[in-house]
Regions:
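Polytopic transmembrane helical bundles with strong interfacial aromatic enrichment
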Residues: 1-190
Length: 190
């Protein structure tokens, strides 16, 4: 099996860091809610608190990795400019999308979302992690702050989900191609 270098980076960005982030979001929201909602102390609040801190830090790393790889590794390939008079735009995803009225929306809405709004994901989850690390289980005594943390966590999840949807659709219609070929596994000759 073969994959190009650019397709590999796209896979790492979307399915690796982005996909894991989306999977982790639901667990984080439930964990934050359970740890900060109850007025009674649980059996082991310090152990749970430590776990949620580590979990949130891992989410921060996933979110920043996805956004930074998307912005500084994949996006320049997406925006590559074709030479004058080029007819085959398959190596120039942005121009391929913009060349068709049926697909221009994937660039004008989808990629614009990914370029700008997707940055909200790591920023908001970093805020959530910072506030939780600062207040921990005591966050239950600060209802407005607790509500803000949960809302920002949910908003981060929604923004990441929409960015993931647009990324998958853009990759389906105009994938980032090129680069050296990576061999995955060995092929036997018959």
């Amino acid at each position: 099996m073969e994959i190009t270098e650019r397709a590999f980076w796209t896979l790492i960005h979307g399915m690796g860091f982005g996909g894991l982030y989306l999977l982790a979001c639901s667990g984080a929201l439930v964990g934050l809610y359970q740890l900060t909602a109850s007025s009674t102390s649980s059996e082991s609040p310090h152990g749970q608190e430590r776990f949620v801190r580590i979990y949130l830090i891992a989410m921060v790393v996933l979110a920043w990795a996805a956004v930074l790889i998307g912005a500084y590794v994949i996006y320049p390939w997406y925006r590559a400019t074709p030479p004058p008079g080029a007819v085959d735009l398959s190596m120039f995803p942005q121009h391929l999308l913009m060349s068709s009225p049926a697909m221009i929306g994937w660039h004008s809405l989808g990629m614009e979302w990914k370029e700008h709004v997707a940055w909200f994901v790591p920023i908001s989850i970093t805020m959530v992690a910072f506030v939780f690390i600062r207040y921990g289980h005591d966050l239950r005594n600060h209802t407005q702050l607790r509500s803000a943390v949960l809302v920002f966590g949910l908003a981060s999840f929604v923004a990441a989900g929409i960015a993931g949807f647009f990324g998958a659709e853009i990759d389906e219609h105009a994938p980032v191609r090129g680069g050296s070929t990576i061999q995955l596994g060995h092929r036997e000759a018959k």
